Amino acid sequence: VYFNLIASDVKHSFWIPSAGGKMDTNTENINKFWLNFDSKRAEKAGEYFYGKCAELCGPSHALMDFKVKTKSREEFDQWIEEMKNAKAVADSDLAKQGEKLFQEKSCIGCHAVTPADKRPEEARTAPNLANFGERTRVAGILPHNEENIRNWLKDPEQYKPGNKMTKTYPELNDEELDALTEYLSGLKVETK
């Protein structure tokens, strides 16, 4: 797998220990490298390879973990096609309210909700949420459930100090939290 790495804020270091290799990410240029996720390593790693930031990058450095799930070449190609064609769809009335709030509160200014993010690179300042409803973690650290989604939206600073979401939107009331939680939970690509 080839990686093109660039940071949006400070220097980080992209590292997947069991796959080998790590690479710094800088704000001023793209660093490129590749890792081989062969079947033996994938079997040994289990369902996921675990990665983290290996550069002391700020107050939430210790919380910068991520997972890599391996797929066969055929499964990966199919996944890419699904990602290209996926569209965010709010199914329930509450989810539709959440979708509207996502626009009104300017969440969409930082977060994409479709896999094929066509915004300019400079606008991609926050994680793409296209498959948020399929993730196992909220903000990469909290178990993925409605209560934790609500808690994160209500006070992200409590869980990840120094994150970019804190104080970027007005305080949300309970109805808004319910609607946004419903909308975000419905953002799925693989399990629709």
Where are these regions (language model features)?
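Sequence/structural segment immediately N-terminal to covalent heme-attachment motifs in c-type
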Residues: 90-115, 126-129
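Histidine- and aromatic-enriched segments that form or immediately flank copper-ligand environments
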Residues: 9-28, 66
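Short Fe-S-cluster ligation motifs
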Residues: 83-97, 141-155, 159
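Electrostatic cytochrome c docking/interface patches
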Residues: 74-103, 191-192
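Extracellular/periplasmic metallocenter environments
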Residues: 27-84, 104-108
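Axial heme c-ligation environment in periplasmic c-type cytochrome domains
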Residues: 61-64, 123-132, 152-187
